[in-house]
Curated annotation (Swiss-Prot):
Domain of life: Bacteria
Identification of the protein by name: UPF0349 protein SH2012
HAMAP family according to UniProt: UPF0349
Coiled coil region boundaries: none
A Pfam family reported for this protein in Swiss-Prot or TrEMBL: DUF1450
Family stated for the protein in its record: Belongs to the UPF0349 family.
Signal sequence segment: none
NCBIfam families membership: PRK13669.1
Length: 81
């Protein structure tokens, strides 16, 4: 089972699309895009994604990507089988 990273399309327009594209090319991560994830207070403040339901944030696309991988590693989602 791979970790699921979910993106709000509005947040992708702020730079999250870069992170989405990077993760989409990672065979060990599943990514989904939604019209809205109902996290408007988080979305309006900066970049974020949901990693298996947990909010992960970053000030820049590179920081968000780094924080997503850090969250995945710390929670070891790859060993849930």
């Amino acid at each position: 089972m791979f970790p699921l990273v979910e993106f709000c399309i509005s947040n992708m327009a702020k730079g999250g699309d870069y992170v989405y594209d990077k993760l989409e090319n990672d065979p060990d991560v599943d990514v989904l895009e939604y019209g809205c994830l109902n996290n408007c207070s988080v979305c309006s403040c900066g970049l974020y994604a949901l990693v298996d339901g947990d909010t992960v944030e970053g000030d820049t696309p590179d920081e968000l990507l780094k924080n997503i991988y850090k969250h995945i590693e710390e929670n070891d989602f790859t060993n849930l089988l």
